[in-house]
């Protein structure tokens, strides 16, 4: 330990905790003491928000542990700094449970923000695209004017908008585009967002000229704007409700077969602000066959199971969603380095590709303070 480290360690605990609020990522990397203290501070935040005896923990415990465990290729050695934990079990206290007690920073973020949503039907379209060979202009009269491409859930904290304040949350949709010709259909795929079995739904969609920006095959992330405010938070004050099931439905209004023959495949959604300083419209990633590096099936399963349980518990109406169909699918989560090619809202803004290459993997969990 050098002199500066020694001087830092001589400061009182209150100062250490205060410093963690300002520079958490930098300070927790200093030594084991600050890593453990950082973990403890997020345990306190989590349990101050959702008490240990709240039913929410029983709802999420199993799938949350599986999600955190799936991140071990990224952080197993760091997680194992926190010792004296036990394998997850029904009778194991929360604060002793492996993958929770050693990972409160990730747990806090997983509960504070809506998780990624994957379209579980994406692979059947991409696998059948060569055999189908259907013409997007054929059988016009027999095609429905509107079809649901996917419908899914993720959990949203009740106080989400009051906490975010001036930090709007984006809604991003992911597509596989087989060729530039089919990109013209993207603006006709709209997304209906609302709380499951509660209140009105709102619509978000891509810019009408988005097809002009897509010039080749690839996986594209398209910005649909911001998550709309869906309810008055005051309605839930004093009810003990901490989360609500957020429902997203993708609706195909293309009057074509491009979304079912593999030419244009909706992969899923996320709510991550990939670049805050420059408003962006879309980005393309390399290589094309990289969906398992974008969507962690364990994360998507946790988000869905959490929201599905909330919908069942909170609604008097019948829930049309099945139990989790995500768990057990997909490859183990191994985020590889993917390069993003951004298209910005303001054409004069350009991307620094050197910085993009130098940045750490962007497709690891997005963790806020």
Curated annotation (Swiss-Prot):
Q: How does it assemble?
A: Component of the SCF(UCC1) E3 ubiquitin-protein ligase complex composed of CDC53, SKP1, RBX1 and UCC1. Interacts with CIT2.
Tell me, what does this protein do in biology? Substrate recognition component of the SKP1-CUL1-F-box protein E3 ubiquitin-protein ligase complex SCF(UCC1) which mediates the ubiquitination and subsequent proteasomal degradation of target proteins. The SCF(UCC1) complex acts as a metabolic switch for the glyoxylate cycle and regulates the level of CIT2 protein to maintain citrate homeostasis.
Entry comment on modification after translation: Monoubiquitinated by UBC4.
Which phenotype arises from disrupting this gene? Leads to poor ubiquitination of CIT2 and accumulation of citrate in the cells.
Q: Which GO terms describe its molecular function?
A: protein-macromolecule adaptor activity
Q: Which residues form the F-box domain?
A: 8-45
Q: Does the keyword Ubl conjugation apply?
A: yes
Question: How far does the signal peptide extend, from start to end residue?
Answer: none
GO BP of this protein: protein ubiquitination; SCF-dependent proteasomal ubiquitin-dependent protein catabolic process
Which cysteines form disulfides? none
Identify the pathway: Protein modification; protein ubiquitination
UniProt GO cellular component terms: SCF ubiquitin ligase complex
Signals that turn on the gene:
Expression is down-regulated by the presence of C2-compounds such as acetate.
The source organism is: Saccharomyces cerevisiae (strain ATCC 204508 / S288c) (Baker's yeast)
Q: Superkingdom of this entry's organism?
A: Eukaryota
Q: Which keywords does this chain's UniProt record carry? A: Ubl conjugation, Ubl conjugation pathway
* Name of this chain's protein: F-box protein UCC1
Q: Which residues form a coiled coil?
A: none
């Amino acid at each position: 330990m050098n002199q500066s480290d020694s001087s830092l360690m001589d400061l009182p605990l209150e100062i250490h905790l205060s410093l963690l609020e300002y520079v958490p990522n930098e300070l927790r990397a200093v030594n084991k003491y600050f890593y453990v203290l950082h973990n403890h501070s997020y345990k306190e935040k989590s349990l101050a928000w959702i008490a240990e005896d709240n039913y929410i923990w029983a709802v999420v415990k199993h799938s949350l542990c599986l999600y955190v465990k799936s991140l071990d290729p990224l952080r197993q050695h760091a997680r194992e700094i926190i010792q004296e934990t036990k394998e997850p079990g029904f009778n194991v206290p929360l604060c002793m449970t492996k993958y929770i007690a050693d990972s409160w920073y990730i747990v806090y973020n997983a509960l504070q923000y809506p998780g990624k949503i994957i379209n579980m039907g994406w692979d059947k379209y991409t696998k059948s695209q060569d055999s189908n060979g259907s013409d997007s202009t054929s059988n016009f009269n027999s095609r429905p004017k509107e079809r649901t491409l996917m419908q899914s859930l993720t959990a949203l904290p009740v106080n989400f908008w009051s906490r975010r304040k001036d930090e709007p949350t984006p809604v991003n949709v992911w597509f596989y585009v087989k060729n530039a010709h089919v990109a013209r259909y993207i603006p006709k795929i709209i997304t209906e967002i609302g709380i499951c079995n509660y209140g009105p739904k709102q619509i978000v969609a891509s810019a009408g000229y988005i097809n002009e920006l897509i010039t080749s095959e690839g996986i594209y992330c398209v910005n649909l704007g911001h998550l709309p405010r869906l309810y008055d938070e005051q309605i839930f004050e004093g009810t003990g409700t901490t989360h609500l099931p957020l429902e997203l439905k993708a609706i195909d209004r293309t009057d074509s077969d491009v979304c079912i023959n593999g030419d244009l495949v909706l992969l899923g959604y996320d709510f991550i602000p990939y670049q805050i300083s420059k408003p962006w419209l879309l980005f393309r990633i390399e290589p094309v066959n990289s969906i398992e590096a974008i969507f962690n099936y364990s994360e998507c399963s946790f988000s869905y199971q959490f929201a599905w349980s909330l919908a069942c518990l909170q609604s008097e109406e019948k829930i049309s969603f099945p139990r989790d169909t995500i768990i057990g699918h997909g490859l183990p989560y191994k985020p590889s380095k993917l390069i993003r090619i951004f298209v910005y809202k303001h054409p004069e803004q350009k991307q620094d590709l050197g910085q993009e290459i130098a940045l750490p993997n962007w497709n690891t969990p997005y963790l806020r303070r």
